[in-house]
Amino acid sequence: MKVFLDTNVWLSATIFSGLCEELVLQCAQQECLFSSDLVRTEAHEVLLRKFPQVPNACDLFDAAWQAAQGIPDMAEPGGDNDRRLVKAAAAMDIDLFVTGDKRMLGWGSAKRVTGVMQIVSPREAWGILFGGVVEP
């Protein structure tokens, strides 16, 4: 199964321990993790702006992000990075797009090369991927 993590999931995994961190670790171990340069760019911008008290945050992010297989970014639709990320993931036949973004979760799915890519929360992704219940 191919898994693409949205920027907010990567950020949570970088700064906080918990479910998102475990998702990154487990998906990296199973070599099913995908990402794009747009995620890295967005993550660095947010880490520098919102977490200046963590001077090595970008290095921590990069260390984890290296485990992901890269996919090409999409230039369109301009001005909507969320839609660009979903479109890029769907174009690469990703199975699960994992996000904490309520707007994106409301989309539910996206057409991909073969079938449909599910857009799910980190908790839903954990259940789908690892079949277990996660402690809150």
Please identify what each model-predicted range represents.
Residues 36, 79, 102-136:
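Acidic, PIN/NYN-like endoribonuclease modules and their adjacent C-terminal/linker elements
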Residues 24-76:
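PIN-domain endoribonuclease scaffold, especially VapC-family toxins
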Residues 9-10, 39, 84-85, 103-104, ...:
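Alpha-helix capping/helix-boundary segments
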Residues 30-33, 93-96, 116:
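Short active-site oxyanion
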Residues 12-14, 46, 107, 128-129:
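Residues that scaffold the ATP/ADP-binding catalytic core of kinase and kinase-like folds
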Residues 20-23, 52, 113-116:
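Glycine-rich, phosphate-binding/catalytic loops in enzymes
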Residues 1-35:
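Short, well-structured N-terminal submotif of metal-dependent ribonuclease cores
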Residues 64-110:
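Active-site neighborhoods of divalent-metal-dependent phosphate/nucleic-acid chemistry enzymes
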